[in-house]
UniProtKB/Swiss-Prot annotation:
GO CC field: eukaryotic 43S preinitiation complex; eukaryotic 48S preinitiation complex; eukaryotic translation initiation factor 3 complex
Major location (coarse): cytoplasm
Classification lineage: Eukaryota, Metazoa, Ecdysozoa, Arthropoda, Hexapoda
PCI domain segment(s): 305-513
Species of the source: Drosophila mojavensis (Fruit fly)
GO MF: translation initiation factor activity
Protein name as catalogued: Eukaryotic translation initiation factor 3 subunit L
Keywords noted in UniProt: Cytoplasm, Initiation factor, Protein biosynthesis
Primary role: Component of the eukaryotic translation initiation factor 3 (eIF-3) complex, which is involved in protein synthesis of a specialized repertoire of mRNAs and, together with other initiation factors, stimulates binding of mRNA and methionyl-tRNAi to the 40S ribosome. The eIF-3 complex specifically targets and initiates translation of a subset of mRNAs involved in cell proliferation.
Gene Ontology BP terms: formation of cytoplasmic translation initiation complex
Length: 538
C-alpha cells in the first residue's frame, strides 16, 4: 500500500521473531516503521502528538489546518495515511492521539481514496468515533483535552456525513454480494444506526448544558453559572453547540423539518451569536434551516435566511478562501442556496437585497425563474434535485429485500411532496398578474382572461383558485424569540382582495421603498466614524 519513492526501498525488511523482551520488541517496531515513513510525515506526527498532549492550541490549529492538508496533497493524494500500528510505534501508542489520528485517517479515506472506503473501513471508523465519544462522555470528570473549534466542528460534521454516506451505501444492494448483505443486516446491524447517531449528539448536548447556557445568555445571565463541570470547558461547550447543528442536519436528512427547527430553539437563528465564528458551521446551519422553512411552506423565513447567509458569504470570502476544500464546499452550498432562493421567490415574490438580485441576474437565474412562473414543472424539479440535501432512510433494506438500488427512494419521496405543493401553486402567478392590473374586476371577466371559453363551472373553479391564492399567500413568519417555529401569520402578497357578490375588489399593499432612512443611517454612521478618526492621536 505504501510502496514507491515516498517510502524508499523496504525490501530488506523481513518479518522478525519476537525476542521475548517487550522493550526490545517495541524499539524494533519503532525503528522498523520509522524507516518506512518519510521524515516529514514522521516529524509531523510526533510534533502533532506532542502539541495535543501539551494542549498548545496555536500549534494544533496550524498543523490541523495547514500542515496536515499539505502533507496529504504531497504524499497521500490518492492513498491512505499510515495505519494505526505504524503511527503508534512512533508516538508511544498514545491512546488519545491515536483516536484523533484515526478520525483524520478515515476522513481522508472518505474524501480522497478512489472508490471510497471499504465496508471494513466504514465499520472501523464508526467504532473509532464510539471510542472518542465514550472517552469524553463516559468519564466521571471532564477530559482535559484542548482542540481548536474548527476541528470540533468538522469532527461533528464528518460524523453526520459518514452516517449519511453509510446509509446510502447500505441502501445500494445491486453492487453487493449475499455475504456483504448478511454482514450489513445481521452482523453489523447497529453500525451507523440512526439511534446511535441521535444518542451521541443528544449526549453531547446534555453533558455540555449548552441549551441552559444559551438560555442564560439570552436572559443576560452569566452562562458559567449553569454550565456545570463539563460545560465550563470550551471543548465540551463547543461540541455541544455543534451537536445542535448536527441534529438539525440529521433531522433534515430524514425529512423531519419541524424537529429540525425545534432542536435549535435555544439558538436565535436570525441573530448573530458568539458561537457563529466558524463560517462553515454558520453556512451549514442557514442552509438546513432555510431548506426546512421552504418545505414547511414558510417562504418568507426561508428567503430571509438564504438572503442573510448569501450576503454573509459575499462579505467574508477571504476568511475561508485559503482552504481550497472548504472553499469548494462553501461555494457548492452557496450555489444550492441560490437555487432554493429562486424557487422561494417564484412561489412567494418579495423584495430582496440588490446585491443578491445582481447575482441572480448575472448567473441567469431569472430565465429559469420566468419559466417557473409560467408553470414549467421540470425547472422546479431540476432546481430542487440539485439543491436539496441527499436524504436518507432511517431504516435499512431488509436482508431478504429484492436486489435493487434504494438510495433514491427518500429523495423521490421528498420530491413528490414538494412537487405536489408546486402543482397547487403553479397557476397563482397568472392570477396575480391579472389582479395587479385592476382595482375592481368581475369574476366572469377574470375567468375569460384565464380561459376565453370559460363556462359557469369555470367561474366556480375560479373561486377555488382565488381561495387557494389567499391561503398560499398567508404564511407564518418569525418575528422575535428564540424559537424558529413561532411567528405570526402575514400576507406575503403585494396585493389583497375580497369578493363582494361577483365583483373582486383589489387593493395594492406594496410598501414603497424608503430610501431616505437608508441614507440617513449611512450619513450618521459616517459622521460617527469621522469623529473617531479625529480623536485618534498619531
Amino acid at each position: 500500500m505504501y510502496g514507491g519513492d515516498d517510502f524508499g526501498n523496504t525490501d530488506f525488511y523481513d518479518d522478525y521473531a519476537h525476542t521475548g523482551d517487550p522493550q526490545l520488541d517495541m524499539e524494533y517496531e519503532r525503528t522498523f516503521y520509522a524507516n518506512r515513513m518519510p521524515d516529514n510525515v514522521k516529524f509531523f506526527l510526533m510534533n502533532f502528538c506532542q502539541a495535543i498532549k501539551e494542549g498548545n492550541l496555536y500549534d494544533i490549529q496550524n498543523m490541523y489546518e495547514n500542515t496536515f492538508p499539505q502533507i496529504s496533497d504531497h504524499h497521500f493524494d490518492k492513498s491512505a495515511w499510515p495505519e494505526e500500528q505504524e503511527v503508534g510505534a512512533i508516538v508511544d501508542n498514545d491512546k488519545v492521539f491515536l483516536i484523533l489520528y484515526k478520525e483524520l485517517y478515515y476522513r481522508h479515506i472518505h474524501a480522497r481514496i478512489p472508490g471510497g472506503p471499504k465496508l471494513e473501513q466504514r465499520i472501523n471508523s464508526f467504532f473509532n468515533y464510539c471510542d472518542f465519544f465514550n472517552l469524553i462522555i463516559s468519564s466521571q470528570n471532564p477530559v482535559m483535552l484542548e482542540l481548536p473549534d474548527i476541528w470540533l466542528w468538522e469532527l461533528v460534521d464528518e460524523f453526520v456525513y459518514q452516517f449519511q454516506n453509510f446509509a446510502q451505501y447500505r441502501a445500494r444492494l445491486t453492487d453487493k454480494s449475499q455475504d456483504e448483505i448478511q454482514q450489513l443486516c445481521v452482523n453489523h446491524s447497529n453500525v451507523w444506526s440512526i439511534l446511535c447517531i441521535l444518542n451521541v449528539l443528544h449526549s453531547l448536548v446534555d453533558i455540555s448544558n449548552i441549551k441552559k447556557q444559551l438560555e442564560a445568555i439570552s436572559q443576560g445571565i452569566d452562562p458559567q453559572t449553569v454550565a456545570g463541570d463539563f460545560g465550563k470547558l470550551g471543548f465540551y461547550k463547543m461540541l455541544g453547540y455543534f451537536s445542535l447543528v448536527g441534529l438539525l442536519r440529521v433531522h433534515s436528512l430524514l425529512g423531519d423539518y419541524y424537529q429540525a427547527i425545534k432542536v435549535l430553539e435555544p439558538i436565535e437563528i436570525h441573530k448573530k451569536s458568539a458561537y457563529s465564528h466558524i463560517p462553515a458551521c454558520q453556512i451549514s446551519t442557514s442552509y438546513y434551516v432555510g431548506f426546512a422553512y421552504m418545505m414547511m411552506r414558510r417562504y418568507a423565513d426561508a428567503i430571509r435566511t438564504f438572503s442573510d447567509i448569501l450576503l454573509y458569504i459575499q462579505r467574508t470570502k477571504q476568511l475561508y478562501s485559503t482552504r481550497s476544500y472548504q472553499n469548494d464546499q462553501i461555494n457548492k452550498q452557496a450555489e444550492q442556496m441560490y437555487h432554493l432562493l429562486a424557487i422561494c421567490l417564484v412561489l412567494h415574490p418579495q423584495c430582496i437585497d440588490e446585491s443578491i438580485q445582481q447575482v441572480l441576474r448575472e448567473k441567469n437565474y431569472h430565465d429559469a425563474m420566468f419559466k417557473m412562473q409560467c408553470g414549467d414543472l421540470e425547472v422546479f424539479k431540476s432546481f430542487f434535485v440539485f439543491a436539496c440535501p441527499r436524504f436518507v432512510s432511517p431504516c435499512p433494506p431488509a436482508a431478504d429485500a429484492p436486489m435493487e438500488d434504494y438510495v433514491k427512494d427518500p429523495m423521490e419521496h421528498q420530491l413528490l411532496v414538494f412537487m405536489d405543493e408546486v402543482r397547487q401553486q403553479k397557476d397563482l402567478p397568472t392570477t396575480r398578474s391579472y389582479l395587479k392590473l385592476y382595482t375592481t374586476l368581475p369574476l366572469t371577466k377574470l375567468a375569460s382572461f384565464i380561459d376565453p371559453n370559460a363556462s359557469e363551472d369555470d367561474v366556480s373553479k375560479l373561486l377555488i383558485r382565488l381561495l387557494c391564492f389567499k391561503h398560499k399567500m398567508r404564511n407564518l413568519v418569525w418575528s422575535k424569540g428564540p424559537s424558529g417555529l413561532e411567528g405570526t401569520f402575514k400576507s406575503g402578497s403585494e396585493l389583497d382582495f375580497y369578493i363582494d357578490d361577483d365583483m373582486i375588489h383589489i387593493a395594492d399593499t406594496k410598501v414603497s421603498h424608503r430610501y431616505g432612512d437608508f441614507f440617513v443611517r449611512k450619513i450618521m454612521k459616517f459622521n460617527d466614524l469621522n469623529r473617531k478618526l479625529k480623536n485618534i492621536n498619531i
